[in-house]
């Protein structure tokens, strides 16, 4: 049986790992074993954070909508409830964009939501108890 030499493949593999780990600090960019470990971790972090990014953006949009809604004297919860009752189908991404770029349009949406909201039965009445 012929002898198999793996030097070329091994060097190619090591070179590709070291090339991918170029921006890392210290030994992680120079030593193959450390670079390989770090590359495995980095790819796992990238995979995890691509999914986490979606939730982070949703949180950002909600906080922006809430801030703009409170500037118009309504809470985020009531705004979303009113928009749903009015049949306005605007997602949070676009709603946050409207809140920042076009405050007048956002105020119009708030008015639509207010009109569609049912009267709050738990709201304090004008009489003193």
Curated annotation (Swiss-Prot):
Keywords: Ribonucleoprotein, Ribosomal protein, RNA-binding, rRNA-binding. GO terms for molecular function: rRNA binding; structural constituent of ribosome. It holds the Pfam family Ribosomal_L20. Gene3D superfamilies: 6.10.160.10, Ribosomal protein L20. The keyword rRNA-binding applies. One of its GO terms (cellular component) is ribonucleoprotein complex. GO terms for biological process: ribosomal large subunit assembly; translation. PANTHER family: 39S RIBOSOMAL PROTEIN L20. Binds directly to 23S ribosomal RNA and is necessary for the in vitro assembly process of the 50S ribosomal subunit. It is not involved in the protein synthesizing functions of that subunit. Belongs to the bacterial ribosomal protein bL20 family. NCBIfam families: rplT_bact. This is Large ribosomal subunit protein bL20. It comes from Mycobacterium marinum (strain ATCC BAA-535 / M). The lineage of its organism: Bacteria, Bacillati, Actinomycetota, Actinomycetes, Mycobacteriales.
């Amino acid at each position: 049986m012929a002898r198999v030499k793996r030097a070329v493949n091994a060097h190619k593999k090591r070179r590709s790992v070291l090339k991918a780990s170029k921006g890392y600090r210290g030994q992680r960019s120079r030593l193959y074993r450390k670079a390989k470990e770090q590359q495995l971790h980095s790819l796992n972090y990238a995979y995890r954070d691509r999914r986490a990014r979606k939730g982070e953006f949703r949180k950002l949009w909600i906080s922006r909508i809430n801030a703009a809604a409170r500037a118009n004297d309504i809470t985020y919860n009531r705004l979303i409830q009113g928009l749903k009752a009015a049949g306005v189908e605007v997602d949070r991404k676009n709603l946050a964009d409207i809140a920042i770029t076009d405050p007048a349009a956002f105020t119009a949406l708030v008015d639509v939501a207010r009109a569609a909201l049912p009267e709050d039965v738990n709201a304090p009445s004008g009489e003193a108890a």
